[in-house]
Amino acid sequence: MRVELGTISLHHFEGRVMAQSITTLTSANFDETIGSSDLPILVDFWAEWCGPCKAIAPVLAEIATEQAGKITIAKLNVDDYGDIAMRFNVMSIPTLIVFNKGEAAKRLVGAQGKGKLLQELAEFLPT
């Protein structure tokens, strides 16, 4: 079960509810959000019809909860905001781009497991 309320999503996993903040990006807030963040931002370029995108959603939700205050997790729907996807040369989804200090610093294409994602994000997370 998933209910979206602004930037707060509630996910139901194995009988418990986990809440975390996942930022929804649009053309109106993308540049300001990326440019003004003190934290690294992992942007998930996704679409509603994309099976692998749906498969990694719970993984991103877990990371958002576990790494709160260390990294921001954000999502951008490529069907709604294709201009931004084109700007960052997103050709396949899911594409995950880590923005650090306003710049695209790392790109991952395809569904990733939690361990692999955390390994890829380690250089951006405080120790």
Q: What is each PLM-predicted segment?
A:
Residues 45-59:
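Conserved redox-active cysteine motifs that mediate thiol-disulfide chemistry
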Residues 38-39, 45-49, 92:
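Short pre-active-site segment immediately N-terminal to redox-active cysteine/selenocysteine motifs
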Residues 38-40, 55-76:
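Conserved helix-turn-beta segment immediately C-terminal to the redox Cys motif
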Residues 1-17:
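Short, Lys/Arg-enriched N-terminal segments with co-localized hydrophobic residues
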Residues 97-127:
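Non-catalytic, surface beta->alpha helical segment in thiol-disulfide oxidoreductase systems
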Residues 26, 46, 72-74:
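Conserved Rossmann-like nucleotide-binding pocket used by diverse enzymes
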Residues 78-85:
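Structural microenvironment flanking redox-active thiols in thiol-disulfide oxidoreductases
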Residues 22-41:
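A short beta-strand-turn-helix
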